[in-house]
Regions:
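Catalytic DNA-binding helix-loop module of base-excision-repair DNA glycosylases/AP lyases
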Residues: 134-180
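Aromatic-residue detector
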Residues: 32-40, 47, 130, 140-145, ...
Length: 242
């Protein structure tokens, strides 16, 4: 017997008060459910994105990494030499903490480099912003999901080498932060996009968010990534690819 029922019977026996009305548990559950579904989303402005982008560039650690990646990709833009591609993979693994090196039992550096080099017209397709390259890299040899790495590899080549903003980055910080800005979006949906390498759906979500907030600055995809990462990251927590 619940404490509420005890209290109701006690009052009835004393005659001091009318019995408490029974609580409609279904109504309570329904009201709670409505409250849970009602979630106020945050908004974005061009100024917010620009500010955090500049903060990233000014960061003594991450800003220098950003400039190093830009310099190396401009110097070695093509993806036809397995040895150079291997070096670029290692660069991304180090600067972005994609942790590919921790999964040598699933894929090794030489194999991943061969997969990238083996993609037909890779560089031209990056220049054109071809989204189909991302899932090819992400699925790699079929033993590991490299979705986050693939988005970063393509995004940085597009931005640094060709000066275009056609790609968007996925990582754990974005997955956790994005639902704060998109009504009805849940992390489980984003995780499904990652696990199935559905880059098209993921990018469409990002584009809809930017359009809904009238974000029209140059490199808006790249600056959104910097905004979300710099605002919501946990400095002590390394991102894991898996």
């Amino acid at each position: 017997m619940t404490s509420v029922r005890y209290f109701r019977e006690y009052l009835a026996a004393k005659g001091d008060s009318e019995p408490l009305p029974a609580v409609n548990q279904k109504a309570v559950r329904k009201t709670s459910s409505v409250r849970m579904r009602t979630r106020e989303v945050l908004t974005l402005t061009n100024e917010m994105l620009e500010k955090e982008h500049q903060n990233v560039l000014a960061d003594p650690g991450y800003g220098s990494d950003y400039r190093l990646i830009d310099s190396i990709l401009k110097r070695f833009p093509e993806n036809t030499d397995p040895e150079l591609v291997s070096l670029k993979i290692a660069l991304f693994d180090m600067t972005y903490s994609t942790n590919i090196g921790r999964h040598r039992q699933k894929i090794v550096l030489e194999e991943l480099a061969s997969i990238i080099v083996g993609i037909k017209d890779f560089d031209e397709r990056i220049r054109q912003g071809d989204p189909s390259i991302v899932p090819i890299i992400a699925k790699s040899n079929g033993k590991i999901n490299l979705f986050s790495f693939a988005t970063k590899y393509c995004t940085n080549h597009a931005v640094c080498v060709y000066g275009n903003d056609d790609y968007v980055i996925f990582d754990r910080v974005v997955k956790d932060a994005l639902p704060k800005f998109v009504s009805g979006l849940h992390k489980i949906t984003i995780e499904q996009w990652r696990s199935t390498c559905n880059y098209t759906a993921y990018k469409e979500c990002i584009d809809e968010l930017l359009n809904a907030n009238d974000i029209d600055i140059p490199f808006r995809h790249r600056k959104l990534d910097h905004y979300l990462w710099h605002t919501y990251r946990k400095p002590s927590e390394e991102e894991a690819e898996e």
